[in-house]
């Protein structure tokens, strides 16, 4: 056996050991053997609930390895921890030197080619939605047949090793999970168990149109909500991401909404004129409990934007969903960089002049797009994603790996930070005192023109694997950092203060009510920003309490969407409760707020971000 592999086995690192058993093989074969060895050495956890693995267990870190699978970057490596382990267990200096060389190579696989100034909400990150419809329809056995039918190639050998490892793990797992995963789902129970296993394989990333495909198996099972609550618990514990609900199966969708009691999944509801009244009522019930999920999406606006701004064709346009926070992608057939990074408009403006501003934006975008393409090519060579290659169309059919052109669609989410701040600053330079978010024509027009220019510019550049760029405003918790290095700006923002956290108003400056705020945001060219233009809004919790208030809230949302608004995510907490939570966060462990593009427990936020949430205007109708 290769000496490096032998050392890694002794140190209890089977994934890394497998990668070095035949280190002169192709990179994709090395990753495939690494995954196989990981699963062969992993002890399946016990069965302790309806789902397998149960929420408290993690397929990918069962023994706390230093070298781990990573769903976005293929590999995670705690090099310092592995070196410490080597110093403890390896007496031979030659073996220690070999281990250092191993760690250097593993670190190389994780190389990040996105310059720090462009790491706006991401740095070549990749969320994904596997083809769960096909998984439930074919089972693992169907995928095995398709891999066996591939022509001989390094990729086929890598996928065969990956499948062999998963199959070995399932064979040793308790209960009937092996049968559920191997065969097509036959009922709600087997569908939920199979889905959960494959979702865990992809690290609970994003589920796509969950109520659509899972609703096909729902037949009024009395314990269905308990299954959903256990699944949501797993998603919350493992920092999973997005579930989209379409209301195609209203009875099941209502259960999905009713089960939402935690900060995750980061769910969304496609809304439109045909959304059933009972779905709206269930949505307001959830919001009324203080849970800010799901957010609402304007289905018609996305469909229009996708027709004009994506390369998706035919029925695939109906498969749009969201990954991560709320990044556009196409269910089961796409590899969309989400988020790749982006541009900080306020930083660019502060280091430019009004006359040079647009030219400087273009120069930054050229540099960023070049970095994204270079990072994409590096990933194609050195970061194979074999789980996604198996379960995303058309990788098997094309005999090409997920990062190397196998998926049907590619593209990149390009984040825009400081949009509102820059618009307010440009307005101030022209002597306009109003702030965006108050339905003030002059500053709103400045924001509209700026957004139109920037989004149109972004869309001109080919990105990951030559795919389109999708402009977005999705800042996670990073909006504080993206303001920390920016000097004081013309709008009155002090040096180092956070930039705006969404496509809406700077916190506390929207003073003319919710209709004015939504009117301002609706003027932005949302059809050009389908990456998603996140809108964070604080609403008075009582709005979801009474039937009369609910009618007004529904009318407000539908009016926003009728004007072209794209997305809205609320935080429904009264100011008094939020003040108490700010004074003593530990006393409010279950308080959930919307931050950037997702939900988070308030007591987990930094003090700076807690204060930013407190500063937001609390709107009432």
Where are these predicted regions, by residue range?
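Long amphipathic alpha-helical scaffold segments
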Residues: 178-183, 196
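Low-complexity, highly charged intrinsically disordered N-terminal segments
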Residues: 159-162, 166, 170
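Conserved catalytic cores of very large enzyme subunits
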Residues: 1-159, 186-621
């Amino acid at each position: 056996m290769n000496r490096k592999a032998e050392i890694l086995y002794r140190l209890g690192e089977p994934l890394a050991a497998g990668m070095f058993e035949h280190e002169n093989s192709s990179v994709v074969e090395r990753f495939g053997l690494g995954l196989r060895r990981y699963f062969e050495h992993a002890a399946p956890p016990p069965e302790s609930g309806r789902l397998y693995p149960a929420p408290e267990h993690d397929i990918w870190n069962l023994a706390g390895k230093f070298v781990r699978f990573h769903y976005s970057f293929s590999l995670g490596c705690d090099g310092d921890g592995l070196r410490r382990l080597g110093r403890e267990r390896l007496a031979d200096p030659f073996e220690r030197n070999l281990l250092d060389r191993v760690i250097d190579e593993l670190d190389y696989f994780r190389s990040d080619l996105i310059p720090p100034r462009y790491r706006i909400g991401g740095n070549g990150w990749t969320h994904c939605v596997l083809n769960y419809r096909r998984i439930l329809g074919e089972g693992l056995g169907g995928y095995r047949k398709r891999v066996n039918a591939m022509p001989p190639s390094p990729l086929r050998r890598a996928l065969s090793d990956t499948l062999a490892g998963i199959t070995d793990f399932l064979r040793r797992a308790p209960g009937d999970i092996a049968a559920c995963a191997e065969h097509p789902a036959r009922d709600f129970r087997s569908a939920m168990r199979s889905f959960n296993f494959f979702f865990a394989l992809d690290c609970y990333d994003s589920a796509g149109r969950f109520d659509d495909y899972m609703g096909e198996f729902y037949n009024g099972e009395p314990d269905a909500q308990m299954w959903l609550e256990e699944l949501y618990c797993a998603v919350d514990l493992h920092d999973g991401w997005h579930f989209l609900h379409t209301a195609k199966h209203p009875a099941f969708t209502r259960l999905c909404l009713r089960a939402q009691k935690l900060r995750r999944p980061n769910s969304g509801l496609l809304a439109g004129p045909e959304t059933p009244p009972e779905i709206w009522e269930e949505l307001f019930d959830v919001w009324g409990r203080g849970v800010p999920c799901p957010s609402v999406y304007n289905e018609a606006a996305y469909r229009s934007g996708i027709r004009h701004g994506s390369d998706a064709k035919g029925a695939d346009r109906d498969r749009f969903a969201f990954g991560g926070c709320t990044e556009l992608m196409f269910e089961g057939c796409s590899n969309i960089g989400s988020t790749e990074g982006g541009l900080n408009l306020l930083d660019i403006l502060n280091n430019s002049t009004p006359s040079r501003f647009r030219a400087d934006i273009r120069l930054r975008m050229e540099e960023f797009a070049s970095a994204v393409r270079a990072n994409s090519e590096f990933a194609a060579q050195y970061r194979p994603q074999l789980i996604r290659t198996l379960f995303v169309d058309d990788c098997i059919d094309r005999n090409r790996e997920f990062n190397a052109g196998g998926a049907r669609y590619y593209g990149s989410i390009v984040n825009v930070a400081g949009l509102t701040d820059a618009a307010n600053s440009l307005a101030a330079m022209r002597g306009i005192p109003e702030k965006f978010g108050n339905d003030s024509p002059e500053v709103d027009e400045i924001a509209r023109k700026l957004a139109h220019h920037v989004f149109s510019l972004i869309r001109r550049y080919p990105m990951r694997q030559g795919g389109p760029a999708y402009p977005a405003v999705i800042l996670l918790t990073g909006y504080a950092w993206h303001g920390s290095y920016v000097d004081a700006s013309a709008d009155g923002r002090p040096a180092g203060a956070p930039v705006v956290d969404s496509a809406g108003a700077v916190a506390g400056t929207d003073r003319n009510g919710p209709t004015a705020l939504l009117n301002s945001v609706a003027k932005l060219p949302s059809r050009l920003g389908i990456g998603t233009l996140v809108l964070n809004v604080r609403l008075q919790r009582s709005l979801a309490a009474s039937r009369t208030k609910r009618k007004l809230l529904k009318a407000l949302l539908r009016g926003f969407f009728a004007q072209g608004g794209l997305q809205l995510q609320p935080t429904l907490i009264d100011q008094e409760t939020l003040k108490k939570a700010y004074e003593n966060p530990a006393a409010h462990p279950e308080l959930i707020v919307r931050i950037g593009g997702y939900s988070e427990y308030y007591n987990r936020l930094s003090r700076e971000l807690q204060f930013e949430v407190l500063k937001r205007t609390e709107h009432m109708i």
